Amino acid sequence: MTSGLEVCSLAKLVYALNQSLDGYVDHDHEKFVPRPALFRHFIEDVRGLSGMVYGRRMYQIMRYWDEDHADWGAEEHEYAAAWRSQPKWVVSRSLKSIGPNATLVADDIDALIRGLKAQLVGEMEAGGPDLAGALTDLGLIDEYRLYLHPVVLGSGKPFFSGPLPSLRLVANELIAEDVIRLTYAPAAQVPTIYSTLNR
């Protein structure tokens, strides 16, 4: 028999991305370049993770942080150090090689995520809308965090690129001067995980 305490000890899988007002999440778009306060928030967020799970495209974008750049300031070096220190799992059938502190996964993502949830504590982060769509379809994402920026892109990749889950808002927070973080959980999970928030 599994106790409630044991269930809560499972690591939480979070899907978090910057998003425009019209719902697009093109990660490399110049309008999403974070201001200092938001970048500091991201540094601390990455430091607190237990690991990261990426799709191919998002991992290739984030590999920018695997090598130092001459024009970096102190905070860029901080972020890079935090990112490099985290274990990463890269879901791809086409990649043949990956960087340090990363594991390539070609099949059975369901078993991978369930195993990581059982082994790790705290929070893991899922990166990339296509991967997140597959994980949503499997019912594996515990929280969705939208960093809503005051920009309109007009087109691009949507935050939800696959199934459209039933969600409930569980938190909202102003991050920096003009970015709002909206946190949603699958509606079916809210009564058990977040019931104390409404007391």
Placement of each model-derived feature along the sequence:
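Enzymes that bind and transform nitrogen-containing heteroaromatic metabolites
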Residues: 2-199
